[in-house]
């Protein structure tokens, strides 16, 4: 970074727009390949229904598992070298891996590359850390809520675009198109994101114990990590059974896939609408109130999902659930900002990402196990119980310690 750039004030609003675009592109890139992942596994030589299901589950989950392992390392490096560098590393690394995925010749190569994708990821948590350290604290809720809509938008559009591209050009070319999107993200970040960061030597870096002692409220921060994990468990538990549940509700109709896709997408649309607004409200009344209210509202929506009789009823409830979900993670992230310093923001957001990834792995496993033993409807009731526990646990953690007063 040039000296003149160091002297120029950073326009955090511009950085927010560019980071939003980066999260959108990476969200779209990740979800582009999701619709045909089992088909690509089959193309790589896996045959048989049970083997195909097993390998599809493994190659899907391994990315999140390795992301959970690698996130703390990248977070520490971000606190030493800067968050922009980590954004560039992530976008370029994932782009190269996507090219190699399109060239994979067998399932083992593909599995290793999916693990490598998880190891080299981390664009979103580093974007969160970058914006969190630049935005005025009293606007954190709105900024992080707005930023979260970037990844959600990309994840919504990605599957549709991926399906169309796969039908038009075949499976392998989609990986190369995805790589191009990630390379575009790299250049957008390189030329448009600005950061004032003074590199820190390894000796000056805070060790884990010092990170914990530097937190304003270590127990609260840990409880927020657990809250993130449970939010993802609750979200992921429904994913494996949603299409089958819709088919059970719809009966003999020809467009079950379309109806399922619509019902799967509506929470994301609702989150897009609610996240910035509820984030802004959280800046006024406190993110802790938004978090607890959204968790309780989620419980009240999950329970009737177990008793719906039509796909329309399920779709309406999932739309409302998406509106609540849009507030949850931004509220958690805002509370993390309030309870940590800029010096350790990279690690705090990366630890939070690790818990999120663990939830992404365990949620679908929990949902599949419950539905196999007790039926589809039981999944919603158990998930409601998990979220209710989360609400009580979060309320108890927040009640014990007063949230620090936020100033400009």
UniProtKB/Swiss-Prot annotation:
Record membrane topology: Multi-pass membrane protein
Lineage: Bacteria, Pseudomonadati, Pseudomonadota, Gammaproteobacteria, Enterobacterales
Keywords: Antibiotic resistance, Cell inner membrane, Cell membrane, Membrane, Transmembrane, Transmembrane helix, Transport
InterPro entries: MFS, MFS_dom, MFS_MdtG_subfamily, MFS_trans_sf, Mutidrug-R_MdtG, Tet-R_TetA/multi-R_MdtG-like
GO molecular function: transmembrane transporter activity
GO process annotations (BP): response to antibiotic; response to paraquat; xenobiotic detoxification by transmembrane export across the plasma membrane
Function: Confers resistance to fosfomycin and deoxycholate.
Family: Belongs to the major facilitator superfamily. DHA1 family. MdtG (TC 2.A.1.2.20) subfamily.
A UniProt-annotated Pfam family: MFS_1
HAMAP family linked to this entry: MFS_MdtG
Residues spanning the membrane: 16-36, 58-78, 92-112, 115-135, 146-166, 173-193, 224-244, 256-276, 290-310, 319-339, 378-398
Cellular compartments per GO CC: plasma membrane
The name this protein goes by in its record: Multidrug resistance protein MdtG
Gene name, Swiss-Prot/TrEMBL: mdtG
Localisation: Cell inner membrane
């Amino acid at each position: 970074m040039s000296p003149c750039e160091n002297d120029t004030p950073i326009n955090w609003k511009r950085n927010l727009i560019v980071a939003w675009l980066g999260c959108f592109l990476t969200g779209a890139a990740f979800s582009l390949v999701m619709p045909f992942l089992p088909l690509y596994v089959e193309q790589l030589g896996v045959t048989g229904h049970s083997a195909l299901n097993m390998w599809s589950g493994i190659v899907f989950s391994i990315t999140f598992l390795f992301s959970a392992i690698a996130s703390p390392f990248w977070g520490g490096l971000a606190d030493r070298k800067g968050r922009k560098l980590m954004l560039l590393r992530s976008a370029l690394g994932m782009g190269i891996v996507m090219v190699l995925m399109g060239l994979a010749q067998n399932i083992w190569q593909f599995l290793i590359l999916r693990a490598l994708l998880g190891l080299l990821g981390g664009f979103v948590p580093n974007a969160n850390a970058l914006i969190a350290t630049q935005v005025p604290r009293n606007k954190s809720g709105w900024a992080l809520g707005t930023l979260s809509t970037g990844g959600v938008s990309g994840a919504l559009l990605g599957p549709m675009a991926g399906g169309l591209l796969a039908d038009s050009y075949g499976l392998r070319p989609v990986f190369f198109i995805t790589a191009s999107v990630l390379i575009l993200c790299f250049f957008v970040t390189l030329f448009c994101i600005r950061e004032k960061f003074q590199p820190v030597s390894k000796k000056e870096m805070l060790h884990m114990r010092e990170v914990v002692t530097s937190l304003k409220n270590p127990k609260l921060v840990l409880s927020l990590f657990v809250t993130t994990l449970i939010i993802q468990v609750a979200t992921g538990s429904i994913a494996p059974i949603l299409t089958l549940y819709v088919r059970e509700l719809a009966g003999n109709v020809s467009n079950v896939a379309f109806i399922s896709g619509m019902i799967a997408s509506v929470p994301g649309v609702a989150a897009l609408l609610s996240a910035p607004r509820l984030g802004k409200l959280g800046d006024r009344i406190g993110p802790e109130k938004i978090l607890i209210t959204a968790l309780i509202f989620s419980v009240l929506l999950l329970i009737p999902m177990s008793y719906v009789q039509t796909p329309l009823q399920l779709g309406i409830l999932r739309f409302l659930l998406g509106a609540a979900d849009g507030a949850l993670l931004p509220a958690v992230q805002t509370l993390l900002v309030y309870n940590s310093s800029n010096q350790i923001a990279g690690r705090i957001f990366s630890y939070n990402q690790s818990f999120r990834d663990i939830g992404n792995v365990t949620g679908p496993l929990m949902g599949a196990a419950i539905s196999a033993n007790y039926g589809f409807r039981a999944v919603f009731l158990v998930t409601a119980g998990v979220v209710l526990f989360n609400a009580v646990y979060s309320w108890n953690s927040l009640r014990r310690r007063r949230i620090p007063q936020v100033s400009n």
